Each structure stands twice: as structure tokens, then as C-alpha cells.
Amino acid sequence: MVKNSVISIIFQEEKRGSVEFQVFNFTNKIRRLTSHLELHKKDYLSQRGLKKILGKRQRLLAYLAKKNRVRYKELINQLDIRETKTR
């Protein structure tokens, strides 16, 4: 939790429309939905919403990896998420 608060301070200074901020926002939503779904396993609407958000984040990360690999690596490390699989 402390790591997220430090990251949130960093991202508040950046532009809200940036790819990094959007990925950060989606990551927070994903973590909240994941903890919700651990308690409510049969909440299928939330499961669908989680899958949609995961897809959006995956597309944004793929775009960032293609455009700027250094910023992509930094963001992955800061948010503590795995690198997307490439074909």
C-alpha cells in the first residue's frame, strides 16, 4: 500500500491523459475488483468488467511498448505488473 501511495503522488503531477496515468488508473481498478471478486466469487458482472479493463490496459501497454520501450519498462517496474507476452 505504501508503494501505491508514493506512485499516486508521482502520477498526480503528470497529465491525466497520458498513457502512464491511464495504465496506473486501470491497475488500481483491477486491484480493487480483484479483492472484491475474492469475496464475491459469483459476481459475473464484475468479472466481465474486470476482463474489459484488463483488455484496455493490455492494449495501452502494447502501444507504450511499441512507442517507447524505456518508459514501458519503468512503468512495469513501478506498478509491479508482469510484462505482456508478445507473439
UniProtKB/Swiss-Prot annotation:
Species name: Atropa belladonna
Pfam families linked to this entry: Ribosomal_S15
Main location per the UniProt record: plastid
Gene Ontology CC entries for this record: chloroplast; ribonucleoprotein complex; ribosome
Alphabetic keyword roster: Chloroplast, Plastid, Ribonucleoprotein, Ribosomal protein
NCBIfam families documented for this protein: S15_bact (TIGR00952)
HAMAP family assigned: Ribosomal_uS15_B
Subcellular location: Plastid, Chloroplast
A GO BP entry: translation
InterPro entries per record: Ribosomal_uS15, Ribosomal_uS15_bac-type, uS15_NS1_RNA-bd_sf
Family statement: Belongs to the universal ribosomal protein uS15 family.
Protein name as catalogued: Small ribosomal subunit protein uS15c
Transmembrane segments: none
Quaternary structure (record): Part of the 30S ribosomal subunit.
